[in-house]
Amino acid sequence: MAPKKKGKSEGLTAASPQPAKATPNWPAFTPLVPKSDLALEEVLQGQIVTIPNFWTATLCKNYVSFLSSLPLTTTPGKPKKGDAVRVNDRFQIDDPVFAERLWSQTALKSLVTEAQRKELWGGEVVGLNPNIRIYRYSKGQFFDQHYDDSNNVTLPGAPPTLARTTWTLLLYLTSPATGCIGGETVFYPYSPRKKSKDPTPEPFVVDLEAGLALLHRHGADCMLHEGREVTDGEKWVIRSDLCVKR
């Protein structure tokens, strides 16, 4: 894995959102594609997994309409030292109920918890990070090259479950079909043989598809990646993380 000289994303603040916000009245997850019609696709071995059509176009459209009503905050123009440059609008809330709904009321839980995938995720997956983040990228906005950190979290329950995040979950709600141009997520493979004469590996590009769920490994083994500039329309994303027992 590449030495981490580029900026990081959210660090420990990702696990500690301010608790004062009122919990949104999230819309129901309807309509959904039947679980039997969905599958995990490991598009880059050990690093990137996608679930095409995880959400329907109608559900994505309903959520974009709802999320537009939330009090989004524009990120600072100058990031903290060591953080990557990011220009977007965001909403962040600690909402264990929504995280559990997204985990268990969709196909995500059944797809992710298949026994043979435990090694892939870095442990026994027990749910999603209750730290829910909503991102909107308008024309000219982007997220520069960075790595996503792993965080320790506590999932509510009796007793609570001590967990850590191992994979980022990004759920795309818009795409070129909805008028969003640009905004692709780009991953940069790293060749450990610095003196090798082999050409630098080509970047791995994940195009926007409304309803696509993208999972990518983070923490110590995170690939350098970025969100390209949006050149037209709006890019909407719901962000959480897979949590494994610690």
Locations of regions flagged by a protein language model:
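Fe(II)/2-oxoglutarate oxygenase catalytic core
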Residues: M1-A213, D221-R246
